[in-house]
Amino acid sequence: MAYYSIGDVAERCGINPVTLRAWQRRYGLLKPQRSEGGHRLFDEEDIQRIEEIKRWISNGVPVGKVKALLETTSQDTEDDWSRLQEEMMSILRMANPAKLRARIISLGREYPVDQLINHVYLPVRQRLVLDHNTSRIMSSMFDGALIEYAATSLFEMRRKPGKEAILMAWNVEERARLWLEAWRLSLSGWHISVLADPIESPRPELFPTQTLIVWTGMAPTRRQNELLQHWGEQGYKVIFHAP
């Protein structure tokens, strides 16, 4: 029987090794073998279980309830994403940056990035914009904490093999969201360099040998599609990022 290291499994399944360790230690979802040196060893059955765990989480099930679902056929609901959103709002109302950072770090270890961004962070950011009882300071504090964590994650991912790319916001004023998308891309094998300010035109001729990833926050306009096609015909590596 073939066995795989935690690094091999993380790359194959698209899951951060820290998340795999949390699934094992905190939630009892995985039971890998151990080498003589004490290192985790996973087999094909473990990998299948990881994929099943990912499917449950993608369906909106909180990681703490996945173990029971692996042993039964019942399914949770989206209510737990709402619970996490409410928890984040409560922390923000405390105006405690240290507690906010700590919770963002812990969530990053427990849930896949895509699910956190789509079901927790983006909904909370939207609620902060719409909630007239929430000061702009809270929204700014939340964005600052997210950018800080995303930047740290980008740095950590550079220690692993990956492809270099430059990410830029194309005519969209969403700095915090840009960093969230950089974080999302980094866990797909990219070493991302972020251009912090919005760009009116990507100017790929300035980066002739590099890969550019452009993000617009919405579907590209007709003109943007024309430019993307033109740049491709010119031999430039310009990728449109649509999360």
Curated annotation (Swiss-Prot):
Gene3D superfamilies assigned to the protein according to its UniProt record, in alphabetical order: 1.10.1660.10
HTH merR-type domain residues: 3-72
Signal peptide: none
DNA-binding region per UniProt: 6-25
UniProt keywords, alphabetically: DNA-binding, Repressor, Transcription, Transcription regulation
Induction (record text): Expression is strongly activated (7-fold at 16 degrees Celsius compared to 37 degrees) at low temperature.
One Pfam family this sequence matches: MerR_1
GO molecular function: DNA binding; DNA-binding transcription factor activity
A biological process term (GO) from this entry: negative regulation of DNA-templated transcription
Effect of deleting the gene: 3- to 20-fold derepression of several genes coding for small proteins including the ycgZ-ymgA-ariR-ymgC operon. While the BluR/F system is induced at low temperatures under blue light irradiation, it is not essential for growth under these conditions. When both lon and bluR are disrupted, levels of OmpF decrease, leading to lower drug susceptibility, with a greater effect at 26 degrees than at 37 degrees Celsius. The mechanism is not yet understood.
Domain of life: Bacteria
Functional note: Controls the expression of several small proteins that may play a role in biofilm maturation. Binds to and represses the operator of the ycgZ-ymgA-ariR-ymgC operon and also regulates ynaK. Binding is antagonized by BluF upon blue light (470 nm) irradiation. Blue light may increase the affinity of BluF for BluR, allowing it to be released from its operator.
Quaternary organization: Interacts with BluF.
Protein name, entry field: HTH-type transcriptional repressor BluR
The species this protein was found in: Escherichia coli (strain K12)
Gene name for this UniProt entry: bluR
